[in-house]
Amino acid sequence: MSTTPARTLDTEELEQRVKHMYQEVALEPEREFHFETGRALAERLGYPAADLDRIPAAAIDSFAGVGHFLDLADIAPGDAVLDLGSGSGMDSFLASLAAGPDGRVIGVDMTDEQLAKATRLAAEAGIENAEFRSGYIEEPPVEAASVNCVISNGVINLSPDKAAVFAAVAKALRPGGRLALADIVSTEQLPEGVTCDASLWAACIGGAMQRDRYREAIEGAGLQIVEWRENRVYRFVSERADNAVRKYGVTSISLLARHPE
Protein backbone atom coordinates (compact mmCIF):
# COMPACT_ATOMS: atom_id res chain seq x y z
CA MET A 1 0.00 0.00 0.00
CA SER A 2 1.42 3.39 -0.97
CA THR A 3 1.40 6.36 1.34
CA THR A 4 1.43 10.04 0.52
CA PRO A 5 4.77 11.55 1.57
CA ALA A 6 4.57 14.22 4.23
CA ARG A 7 4.72 17.77 2.94
CA THR A 8 7.57 19.94 4.13
CA LEU A 9 8.06 23.68 4.26
CA ASP A 10 10.38 25.08 1.60
CA THR A 11 12.51 27.29 3.85
CA GLU A 12 14.27 28.99 0.94
CA GLU A 13 10.92 29.98 -0.55
CA LEU A 14 9.81 31.15 2.89
CA GLU A 15 12.84 33.40 3.29
CA GLN A 16 12.32 34.97 -0.12
CA ARG A 17 8.60 35.53 0.48
CA VAL A 18 9.24 37.11 3.88
CA LYS A 19 11.98 39.34 2.50
CA HIS A 20 9.78 40.45 -0.40
CA MET A 21 6.85 41.16 1.92
CA TYR A 22 8.89 43.33 4.26
CA GLN A 23 10.72 45.05 1.43
CA GLU A 24 7.31 46.34 0.44
CA VAL A 25 6.47 47.29 4.04
CA ALA A 26 9.67 49.35 4.17
CA LEU A 27 9.32 51.00 0.78
CA GLU A 28 5.54 51.27 0.35
CA PRO A 29 3.92 51.14 3.80
CA GLU A 30 0.71 52.69 2.45
CA ARG A 31 -0.04 49.52 0.47
CA GLU A 32 -2.54 46.92 1.67
CA PHE A 33 -1.09 43.78 3.28
CA HIS A 34 -2.47 40.70 5.05
CA PHE A 35 -1.81 42.63 8.26
CA GLU A 36 -2.20 46.19 9.49
CA THR A 37 0.61 48.71 9.56
CA GLY A 38 1.25 52.22 10.82
CA ARG A 39 0.52 54.59 13.65
CA ALA A 40 -3.17 53.80 14.09
CA LEU A 41 -2.23 50.17 14.68
CA ALA A 42 0.53 51.10 17.13
CA GLU A 43 -1.76 53.30 19.20
CA ARG A 44 -4.54 50.70 19.27
CA LEU A 45 -2.06 48.09 20.50
CA GLY A 46 -1.17 50.35 23.42
CA TYR A 47 1.83 52.42 22.38
CA PRO A 48 1.52 55.85 24.05
CA ALA A 49 1.06 58.64 21.52
CA ALA A 50 3.50 60.83 23.45
CA ASP A 51 6.25 58.22 22.98
CA LEU A 52 5.50 57.82 19.28
CA ASP A 53 5.78 61.59 18.85
CA ARG A 54 9.44 61.37 19.94
CA ILE A 55 10.65 59.01 17.19
CA PRO A 56 10.80 59.23 13.37
CA ALA A 57 7.32 59.12 11.84
CA ALA A 58 8.56 57.09 8.86
CA ALA A 59 9.55 54.26 11.20
CA ILE A 60 6.01 54.20 12.57
CA ASP A 61 4.56 54.18 9.04
CA SER A 62 6.30 50.82 8.43
CA PHE A 63 5.41 49.35 11.82
CA ALA A 64 3.87 45.89 11.38
CA GLY A 65 3.93 44.59 14.94
CA VAL A 66 1.29 42.46 16.62
CA GLY A 67 1.30 43.74 20.19
CA HIS A 68 2.74 46.07 22.81
CA PHE A 69 5.30 44.73 25.27
CA LEU A 70 7.68 47.55 26.19
CA ASP A 71 5.93 47.92 29.54
CA LEU A 72 6.98 44.33 30.24
CA ALA A 73 10.54 44.95 29.02
CA ASP A 74 11.06 47.62 31.71
CA ILE A 75 14.13 48.97 29.92
CA ALA A 76 16.26 51.09 32.27
CA PRO A 77 18.87 53.78 31.57
CA GLY A 78 22.15 52.14 30.63
CA ASP A 79 20.59 48.88 29.41
CA ALA A 80 21.86 47.07 26.34
CA VAL A 81 18.92 45.90 24.22
CA LEU A 82 18.72 43.47 21.28
CA ASP A 83 15.74 43.83 18.92
CA LEU A 84 15.18 40.67 16.86
CA GLY A 85 13.53 41.47 13.54
CA SER A 86 13.83 45.21 14.04
CA GLY A 87 12.27 46.21 10.73
CA SER A 88 12.27 49.96 10.14
CA GLY A 89 13.18 50.58 13.75
CA MET A 90 10.09 51.70 15.66
CA ASP A 91 10.56 49.46 18.70
CA SER A 92 14.33 49.97 18.59
CA PHE A 93 13.91 53.75 18.66
CA LEU A 94 11.47 53.56 21.57
CA ALA A 95 13.88 51.26 23.41
CA SER A 96 16.70 53.73 22.75
CA LEU A 97 14.73 56.45 24.53
CA ALA A 98 14.38 54.25 27.61
CA ALA A 99 18.01 53.07 27.52
CA GLY A 100 19.27 56.63 27.31
CA PRO A 101 22.68 57.88 26.19
CA ASP A 102 24.51 55.37 28.39
CA GLY A 103 22.58 52.44 26.91
CA ARG A 104 22.51 50.96 23.44
CA VAL A 105 20.11 49.16 21.14
CA ILE A 106 21.11 46.68 18.45
CA GLY A 107 18.47 45.91 15.84
CA VAL A 108 18.90 42.77 13.73
CA ASP A 109 17.01 42.14 10.49
CA MET A 110 17.53 40.07 7.33
CA THR A 111 15.80 42.50 4.95
CA ASP A 112 18.19 45.02 3.40
CA GLU A 113 15.52 47.64 2.72
CA GLN A 114 14.36 47.62 6.34
CA LEU A 115 17.95 47.91 7.59
CA ALA A 116 18.70 50.78 5.22
CA LYS A 117 15.56 52.64 6.25
CA ALA A 118 16.17 52.22 9.98
CA THR A 119 19.83 53.25 9.65
CA ARG A 120 18.91 56.33 7.61
CA LEU A 121 16.18 57.38 10.03
CA ALA A 122 18.51 57.01 13.01
CA ALA A 123 21.11 59.21 11.32
CA GLU A 124 18.57 61.85 10.29
CA ALA A 125 17.10 62.00 13.81
CA GLY A 126 20.49 62.03 15.53
CA ILE A 127 19.77 58.79 17.39
CA GLU A 128 23.28 57.72 18.35
CA ASN A 129 22.53 54.83 20.71
CA ALA A 130 20.79 52.58 18.16
CA GLU A 131 22.45 50.60 15.39
CA PHE A 132 21.15 48.06 12.91
CA ARG A 133 22.91 44.89 11.81
CA SER A 134 22.19 42.42 9.03
CA GLY A 135 21.55 38.91 10.30
CA TYR A 136 19.12 36.16 11.17
CA ILE A 137 17.24 35.95 14.44
CA GLU A 138 18.35 32.33 14.86
CA GLU A 139 21.99 33.53 14.95
CA PRO A 140 22.02 37.25 15.77
CA PRO A 141 25.42 38.93 15.34
CA VAL A 142 25.98 39.82 19.00
CA GLU A 143 28.34 38.54 21.67
CA ALA A 144 27.25 36.05 24.31
CA ALA A 145 25.92 37.50 27.58
CA SER A 146 26.07 41.02 26.16
CA VAL A 147 22.53 42.41 26.59
CA ASN A 148 20.12 43.10 29.43
CA CYS A 149 16.98 42.73 27.36
CA VAL A 150 15.87 41.09 24.12
CA ILE A 151 12.73 42.39 22.40
CA SER A 152 10.84 41.20 19.32
CA ASN A 153 7.51 42.04 17.73
CA GLY A 154 5.60 39.69 15.42
CA VAL A 155 8.75 38.10 14.05
CA ILE A 156 9.54 34.81 15.80
CA ASN A 157 6.48 33.18 14.22
CA LEU A 158 8.24 33.70 10.88
CA SER A 159 11.17 31.50 11.90
CA PRO A 160 11.08 27.81 10.92
CA ASP A 161 13.39 27.06 13.89
CA LYS A 162 11.93 28.75 16.94
CA ALA A 163 13.97 26.61 19.33
CA ALA A 164 17.12 28.09 17.77
CA VAL A 165 15.74 31.61 18.24
CA PHE A 166 15.08 31.11 21.94
CA ALA A 167 18.47 29.42 22.40
CA ALA A 168 20.06 32.48 20.77
CA VAL A 169 18.09 34.74 23.13
CA ALA A 170 19.33 32.81 26.16
CA LYS A 171 22.89 32.99 24.86
CA ALA A 172 22.75 36.76 24.27
CA LEU A 173 21.19 37.62 27.65
CA ARG A 174 23.19 38.41 30.75
CA PRO A 175 22.20 36.55 33.93
CA GLY A 176 18.87 37.96 35.11
CA GLY A 177 18.19 39.45 31.68
CA ARG A 178 14.74 39.75 30.14
CA LEU A 179 12.94 38.64 27.00
CA ALA A 180 9.89 40.76 26.16
CA LEU A 181 8.00 40.10 22.97
CA ALA A 182 4.74 40.06 21.06
CA ASP A 183 4.03 37.24 18.65
CA ILE A 184 1.40 35.09 16.95
CA VAL A 185 0.47 31.69 18.43
CA SER A 186 -2.46 29.29 18.04
CA THR A 187 -4.76 27.44 20.41
CA GLU A 188 -4.88 24.38 18.14
CA GLN A 189 -2.06 22.78 16.20
CA LEU A 190 -2.20 24.06 12.61
CA PRO A 191 -2.62 21.40 9.91
CA GLU A 192 0.09 20.50 7.42
CA GLY A 193 -1.70 22.35 4.63
CA VAL A 194 -1.19 25.58 6.57
CA THR A 195 2.24 24.96 8.10
CA CYS A 196 3.72 24.03 4.70
CA ASP A 197 2.33 27.10 2.89
CA ALA A 198 5.11 29.68 2.65
CA SER A 199 2.64 32.40 1.64
CA LEU A 200 0.70 31.89 4.89
CA TRP A 201 3.95 31.99 6.86
CA ALA A 202 4.82 35.35 5.29
CA ALA A 203 1.38 36.59 6.34
CA CYS A 204 2.14 35.66 9.99
CA ILE A 205 -0.28 32.71 10.01
CA GLY A 206 1.50 29.54 8.87
CA GLY A 207 4.27 29.79 11.44
CA ALA A 208 2.02 30.27 14.46
CA MET A 209 3.13 27.64 16.99
CA GLN A 210 0.60 26.01 19.30
CA ARG A 211 0.76 28.03 22.51
CA ASP A 212 1.80 25.18 24.83
CA ARG A 213 4.61 24.21 22.46
CA TYR A 214 5.65 27.88 22.27
CA ARG A 215 5.94 28.04 26.04
CA GLU A 216 7.88 24.78 26.05
CA ALA A 217 10.30 26.17 23.46
CA ILE A 218 11.01 29.19 25.65
CA GLU A 219 11.40 27.12 28.80
CA GLY A 220 13.52 24.58 26.91
CA ALA A 221 16.05 27.36 26.33
CA GLY A 222 16.32 27.86 30.08
CA LEU A 223 14.14 30.96 30.28
CA GLN A 224 11.39 31.39 32.87
CA ILE A 225 8.07 32.86 31.72
CA VAL A 226 6.92 35.55 34.15
CA GLU A 227 3.89 37.01 32.36
CA TRP A 228 1.74 35.99 29.39
CA ARG A 229 -1.19 37.99 28.05
CA GLU A 230 -3.39 38.02 24.98
CA ASN A 231 -3.60 41.08 22.74
CA ARG A 232 -7.28 40.96 21.91
CA VAL A 233 -7.22 44.26 20.01
CA TYR A 234 -4.92 42.85 17.31
CA ARG A 235 -6.68 41.67 14.19
CA PHE A 236 -5.81 40.24 10.80
CA VAL A 237 -7.25 41.83 7.68
CA SER A 238 -7.33 39.02 5.11
CA GLU A 239 -10.07 36.42 4.69
CA ARG A 240 -7.59 33.53 4.83
CA ALA A 241 -6.20 34.85 8.09
CA ASP A 242 -9.68 35.33 9.55
CA ASN A 243 -10.49 31.71 8.74
CA ALA A 244 -7.39 30.56 10.62
CA VAL A 245 -8.27 32.76 13.57
CA ARG A 246 -11.73 31.24 13.82
CA LYS A 247 -10.77 27.64 13.15
CA TYR A 248 -7.46 27.29 15.00
CA GLY A 249 -7.51 30.09 17.54
CA VAL A 250 -4.66 32.06 15.98
CA THR A 251 -4.05 35.05 18.22
CA SER A 252 -1.52 37.67 19.33
CA ILE A 253 0.20 37.43 22.70
CA SER A 254 2.77 39.42 24.65
CA LEU A 255 5.05 37.89 27.24
CA LEU A 256 7.94 38.47 29.61
CA ALA A 257 10.52 35.80 30.37
CA ARG A 258 13.71 35.97 32.43
CA HIS A 259 17.13 34.43 32.23
CA PRO A 260 18.11 32.82 35.56
CA GLU A 261 20.45 34.86 37.74
For the regions a protein language model found, what residue spans apply to each?
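Short, glycine-/aromatic-enriched active-site segment of Class I SAM-dependent methyltransferases
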Residues: 185-205
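Conserved alpha-helix/loop element of class I SAM-dependent methyltransferases that forms part
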Residues: 35-80, 91-94, 98
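A short acidic, Gly/Pro-enriched loop at the edge of an enzyme's catalytic core
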Residues: 77, 138-149
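Conserved SAM-binding strand-loop segment of SAM-dependent methyltransferases
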Residues: 125-138
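Short alpha-helix
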Residues: 206-228
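N-terminal auxiliary segments of SAM/dcSAM-dependent transferases
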Residues: 1-45
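A short glycine-rich, Lys/Arg-flanked "PGG" loop and its adjoining helix->strand segment in the class I
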Residues: 163-178
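A short SAM/SAH-binding and catalytic strip from SAM-dependent methyltransferases
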Residues: 148-161
